[in-house]
């Protein structure tokens, strides 16, 4: 798709990437300087703009290219998995003392995951937005658990106002909890023990702020 219209360019890119509102290119965060200080739809004030959805979009990526890269790396797969598990276990152990303030991830029974990331949920009395911004200020990237409660995003504004086009079953209390209190940090296999230890130290410092 080619266009010389900046607005169409933004909309096209949003549709390509799940309908996200953020226009920061991959690898660059908070280029607008307002990642954590605005309110969208019915989301909480300060919800991470990288995970605000203003359109009903698609996951349109170069999947053939991604598959080719995956095939080229398949021999490294066991090493990647073991390192992710190692990083997860090290971070989990380092943060064990914070379980009065945070809900830390545990594997499901009879499972041995290759961890995508390290999911943290703040308990009552711990401000996720404040904690995440402190962690980010120390050079550690964080991410939301995607949309949380999707119907509170701007993409639902019109349907919410008209009260039609979708239905809700139950209270959605868990999606609301995720939306308000949950975030990721990484366990990328290229991370060293020193980086994992630094991340744990910063998270614990953030809880004291």
Where are these regions (language model features)?
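Glycine-rich phosphate-binding loop of ATP-grasp-fold ATP-dependent ligases
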Residues: 1
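PLP-dependent aminotransferase class I/II
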Residues: 4-209
């Amino acid at each position: 798709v080619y266009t010389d219209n900046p607005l169409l360019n933004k909309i096209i890119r949003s549709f390509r990437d799940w309908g996200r509102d953020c226009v920061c290119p991959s690898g660059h965060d908070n280029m607008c300087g307002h990642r954590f200080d605005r309110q969208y739809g019915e989301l909480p004030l300060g919800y991470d703009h990288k995970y605000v959805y203003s359109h009903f979009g698609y996951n349109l990526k170069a999947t053939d290219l991604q598959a080719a890269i995956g095939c080229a790396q398949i021999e490294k797969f066991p090493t990647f998995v073991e390192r992710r598990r190692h990083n997860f276990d090290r971070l989990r152990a380092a943060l064990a003392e914070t379980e009065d303030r945070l809900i830390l991830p545990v594997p499901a029974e009879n499972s041995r995951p290759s961890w995508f990331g390290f999911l943290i949920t703040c308990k009552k009395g711990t401000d996720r937005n404040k904690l995440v911004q402190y962690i980010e200020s120390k050079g550690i990237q964080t991410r939301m658990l995607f949309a949380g409660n999707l119907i509170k995003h701007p993409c639902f504004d019109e349907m919410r106002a008209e009260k039609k086009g979708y239905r809700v079953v139950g209270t959605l209390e868990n999606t609301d909890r995720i939306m308000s209190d949950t975030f990721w940090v990484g366990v990328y296999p290229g991370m060293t023990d020193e980086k994992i230890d630094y991340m744990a130290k910063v998270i614990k410092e953030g809880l004291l702020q």
